[in-house]
């Protein structure tokens, strides 16, 4: 089972100079993917317990399109182990003009993570 979201980073997402987006934004998107996976798997939003690993691999800027994918890799009674990957798939080309963008032939992996979510037994509906 997997979930995929695609979202454009806005000027509001930019936190640092040069339009750089805070890495925590990727973790927020991983949380959204995890929530969708838990709803699909258990019929409940569940709770994110912990990240086992987070690796930031490339910068993200306002205007970038990010595709976020996650999947459940292990399932216990209440725990769900998951992996996540965020990839930059479209980038602005302000060097050409203010509205130009390119679809990347090869997406750039910007962040990877793994973690554990929990759905209490009494809230599992599937």
UniProtKB/Swiss-Prot annotation:
Superkingdom of origin: Bacteria
Metabolic or biological pathway, per its Swiss-Prot or TrEMBL entry: Amino-acid degradation; L-lysine degradation via acetate pathway
CDD domains to which the protein is assigned, alphabetical: hot_dog
Catalyzed reactions per annotation: (3S)-3-aminobutanoyl-CoA = (2E)-butenoyl-CoA + NH4(+)
Annotated keywords: Lyase
Record-linked Gene3D superfamilies: Hotdog Thioesterase (3.10.129.10)
SUPFAM superfamilies for this protein: Thioesterase/thiol ester dehydrase-isomerase (SSF54637)
EC number: 4.3.1.14
Name of one Pfam family that matches: 4HBT
Top-rank EC class of the record's enzyme: lyase
Single biological process term from Gene Ontology: L-lysine catabolic process to acetate
GO molecular function: 3-aminobutyryl-CoA ammonia-lyase activity
InterPro entries: HotDog_dom_sf, Thioestr_dom
Protein task: Involved in the anaerobic fermentation of lysine. Catalyzes the deamination of L-3-aminobutyryl-CoA to produce crotonoyl-CoA.
Family: Belongs to the KAL family.
Subunit and interaction comment: Homohexamer.
Name this protein carries in UniProt: 3-aminobutyryl-CoA ammonia lyase
Source species: Acetoanaerobium sticklandii (strain ATCC 12662 / DSM 519 / JCM 1433 / CCUG 9281 / NCIMB 10654 / HF) (Clostridium sticklandii)
Gene this chain is encoded by: kal
